[in-house]
């Protein structure tokens, strides 16, 4: 009996994907829930597993092919196993993964024919390692990412000197863009082509908020079991500024302006695969600890590739913190259909004039990129001034002033 291999549901509003890699060939034997292939959507990578025991008898779509939900991409000649019944053909086990996922583990292969799970296999392949020479410290001798990294760190590096007669073509590498990278590229270009993007800047004296955090961070963490960072201050300040300037929390819908009376704040997170912007829902109803916890949880899921489409969809305004990478100044690009994005940057000590005297203060540049079709320059400037005043006087945030 032939069982079809079909593309499973990919989440709300997602209908297309790209086959990243098949891990089985025609004629290969497979077991129920064994990894068959990886597919990439706009935001995440998913595993498609075998619906039953059997042999691969047909592969209709190969690596790099675009596919749609419900499309047949192959067939398995089912072999009935008395110990393992065939699973329902429509109930594929899916798991979002990310390159070099620290939680991905695999059985240590007994021979070269064994196939490693995608994230570990990629790390092993990129570093030209033999998995048989890697000692697994996981349960049952399984190999974890840490085992691979330990092997890399303890293996001498040999640097090859390129031959002088090599052509430029031989010294280049062509790699197909992932669906996530293509989506990022397309959305950023669409944003620039559609919106009338303008960026305005201001700077913030971080002295008071740094002092406040230093004074209460240990007590805060002890009570709430989450660290007190600066992002919660900026999220709360941003919400107050959005309430003051509602057009920045709105979007253009055809010939109408859609004003949103809720505050779902997207927080940009960099991952190995690219930038994602998970959303903190109803952030205006959260306390500082709730905001910090939500951001921490979403960032962890992003790095592990476990974000769902619901984590990424929607959002009324976004915040991007290039300061964590050392950025001093930037012009962030709007995440459509939103109308604005706040860019945070590195805090560094600079000489500033305070009451006619030069003092050294920890200063941060902030930037607001906004759609000038819906937001006037005065509104953009007022938005940043509001954030500046709240961060420089954090007691106003705490007292809701």
From Swiss-Prot:
Entry note: cofactor: Binds 1 lipoyl cofactor covalently.
Name this protein carries in UniProt: Dihydrolipoyllysine-residue succinyltransferase component of 2-oxoglutarate dehydrogenase complex
Lineage: Bacteria, Pseudomonadati, Pseudomonadota, Alphaproteobacteria, Rickettsiales
Annotated EC: 2.3.1.61
Organism of derivation: Rickettsia prowazekii (strain Madrid E)
Keywords linked to the UniProt accession: Acyltransferase, Lipoyl, Transferase, Tricarboxylic acid cycle
Role description: E2 component of the 2-oxoglutarate dehydrogenase (OGDH) complex which catalyzes the second step in the conversion of 2-oxoglutarate to succinyl-CoA and CO(2).
Coiled coil: none
Gene Ontology biological-process entries: L-lysine catabolic process to acetyl-CoA via saccharopine; tricarboxylic acid cycle
Ranges where the Peripheral subunit-binding (PSBD) domain occurs: 115-152
